């Protein structure tokens, strides 16, 4: 078997094993608390949190003035993190180039993607958290933003994918090991939620959580 074939197979095998091994294995979803959501497009997962809950408010950090056009009743914020070139240079999958594929594989600066939304229930999965778990998740997401001297996230001069989203400077590097989806899994782990040990792909992350209720 050539090394060109062996390496992708080894990566896929490791991803499968990592998806089956839990961290925070003793976690159980509480009967009451704050519900958050996981939305995915088959390749990438976003975390969706309420704009304000239990005294934690995203609006001072991510003012709607940072965005072109946010509905007044948009009360939820979606967060993702990924490699700079992949995020900024590929608004659609048809825009992927060898350069962005190389960046995704070898790694580069991480940026944050933020989008306001009215309704989070389009998301595929839902997770209920205790107030303490929510506080830890909120802090873990906030720590992903690079901050200016005033403690504010640094907005990137980029039009975004639409009128309700924007990009911000992130912290650390993204790579084929620490992917966008692994970043999400790590936020859940830091909150104390059961998550997969290593989940570079969507399916390895989302399978552990219940489907969102679309009836509400």
Predicted regions and their residues:
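Glycine-rich catalytic cores of cysteine/serine-nucleophile enzymes that process amide/ester linkages
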Residues: 38-129
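Internal catalytic-core helix/loop-beta-alpha segment
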Residues: 124-150
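Second-shell loop/turn segments in exported
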Residues: 120-130, 166-175
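Activation targets extended, charge/polar-rich intrinsically disordered C-terminal tails
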Residues: 3-16, 143-216
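General secondary-structure edge motif
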Residues: 27, 92, 117, 121, ...
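N-terminal membrane-anchoring alpha-helices
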Residues: 1-35
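Short, mixed-charge, low-aromatic patches
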Residues: 90-98, 135-145, 160-165
């Amino acid at each position: 078997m050539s090394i060109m074939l062996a390496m992708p197979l080894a990566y896929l095998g490791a991803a499968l094993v990592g998806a089956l091994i839990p961290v925070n294995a003793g976690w159980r979803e509480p009967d009451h608390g704050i519900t958050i959501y996981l939305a995915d497009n088959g390749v990438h997962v976003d975390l969706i949190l309420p704009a304000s809950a239990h005294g934690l408010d995203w609006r001072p950090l991510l003012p709607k003035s940072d965005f072109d056009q946010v509905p007044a009743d948009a009360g939820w914020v979606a967060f993702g993190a990924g490699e700079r070139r992949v995020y900024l240079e590929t608004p659609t999958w048809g825009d992927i180039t060898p350069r962005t594929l190389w960046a995704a594989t070898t790694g580069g600066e991480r940026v944050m993607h933020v989008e306001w939304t009215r309704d989070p229930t389009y998301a595929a999965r839902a997770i209920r958290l205790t107030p303490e778990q929510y506080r830890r998740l909120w802090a873990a997401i906030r720590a992903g933003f690079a901050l200016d001297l005033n403690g504010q996230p640094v907005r990137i001069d980029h039009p975004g994918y639409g009128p309700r989203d924007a990009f911000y400077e992130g912290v650390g590097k993204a790579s084929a090991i620490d992917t966008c989806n692994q970043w999400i899994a790590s936020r859940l782990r830091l909150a104390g939620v059961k998550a997969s040990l290593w989940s570079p792909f969507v399916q390895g992350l989302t399978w552990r959580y219940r489907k969102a209720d679309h009836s509400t």
